[in-house]
Amino acid sequence: MTSSSSNRPFSHRSPNTFLTYPQCPEQPEIISQRIWDLCSHWTPLYIICAREAHRDGNQCLHALIQTEKPVRTTDSRFFDIDGFHPNIQSAISPNKVRDYITKEPLALFERGTFIPRKKSFLGNSSKGNSDKKPSKDEIMRDIISHATSKQEYLSMVQKSLPYDWSTKLQYFEYSANKLFPDIQEEFINPHPTSEPDLLCNESIKDWLQPNIYQVSPQAYLLLQPNCYSIDDAISDLEWLDDLTSKQIMEQGSAASTSSVQQGQENLHGPEA
């Protein structure tokens, strides 16, 4: 799992973590100590770090750290050291990763005792000690130890325990969700912050006129017998609108729809 190439939320969970620091000038011993300290919560057991030279002249650092408990982090910058950001992967085969790191190192540092990957029970019953069939507990322990994602976990269960997978899939899905919980994306406010403008008179007025004040001049003529023309009705309604707006501004609080409508019924125009 890389740390930056995907738009999906970052998540890393593995007892065998393979790190590559491009163009990092630090010594392998210093980087190893920093990584060891970063993983102290998961009880580090072994680390190896080596400097490798590329054909283009650039150098990088490779590191493999093994922990007693799987390293869990959703922070893609967790392993950053002095501004150097590594590529982060789960070492499915720590044996092969270690062989790669020790291939042609310019400098190498090692601490602890390397833990070879245990022989997997998945699909290997025909080789070696085939007389002893592993129990389901042993198979599941192996799957939990090596799976690095929800999809890989379910795929390994399906491959090694097909009958249980087909009859108890909902239980395996539940355990997969617990082992590899979905990462909640950080909330991004769709409304960018701006200078406070709580009144917004122009915008509110544009919405207020067609949505709240729905008294038509024709309806006003029916309610007010002293009003004799459409022009008089429009004039009265405009006066009511201005008066109500001034009262709201003076009181410093918004009037409710019901009180506005009641004011429209009781107040008389300037010609009444």
From Swiss-Prot:
Residues 221-230 are annotated as: Transactivation. Residues 175-187 are annotated as: Oligomerization. A motif (RCR-3) lies at residues 100-103. It is an enzyme of class 3 (hydrolase). A motif (RCR-2) lies at residues 60-65. The keyword Secreted does not apply. It comes from the Viruses. Homooligomer. Interacts (via LXCXE domain) with host retinoblastoma-related protein 1 (RBR1), and may thereby deregulate the host cell cycle. Part of the C- and V-complexes which are RepA-Rep-DNA complexes involved in the c-sense and v-sense transcription. It is found in: Host nucleus; Host cytoplasm. The active site is at Y100. Keywords: Activator, Covalent protein-DNA linkage, DNA replication, DNA-binding, Endonuclease, G1/S host cell cycle checkpoint dysregulation by virus, Host cytoplasm, Host nucleus, Host-virus interaction, Hydrolase, Metal-binding, Modulation of host cell cycle by virus, Nuclease, Nucleotide-binding, Nucleotidyltransferase, Repressor, Transferase. Implicated in enhancement of V-sense gene expression. Acts a an inhibitor of C-sense gene transcription. A motif (RCR-1) lies at residues 18-21. There are 3 rolling circle replication (RCR) motifs. RCR-2 may be involved in metal coordination. RCR-3 is required for phosphodiester bond cleavage for initiation of RCR. The LXCXE motif specifically binds to host RBR1. Pfam families: Gemini_AL1, Gemini_AL1_M. Residues 251-272 are annotated as: Disordered. Its EC number is 3.1.21.-. This is Replication-associated protein A. Belongs to the geminiviridae Rep protein family. GO terms for cellular component: host cell cytoplasm; host cell nucleus. Residues 11-114 form the CRESS-DNA virus Rep endonuclease domain. GO terms for molecular function: DNA binding; endodeoxyribonuclease activity, producing 5'-phosphomonoesters; metal ion binding; nucleotide binding; nucleotidyltransferase activity; structural molecule activity. One of its GO terms (biological process) is symbiont-mediated perturbation of host cell cycle G1/S transition checkpoint. Residues 251-265 have a biased composition (Polar residues). A divalent metal cation binds at E52, H62, E104. InterPro entries: CRESS_DNA_REP, Gemini_AL1_MSV, Gemini_AL1_REP, Gemini_AL1_REP_central. It comes from Maize streak virus genotype C (isolate Set) (MSV).
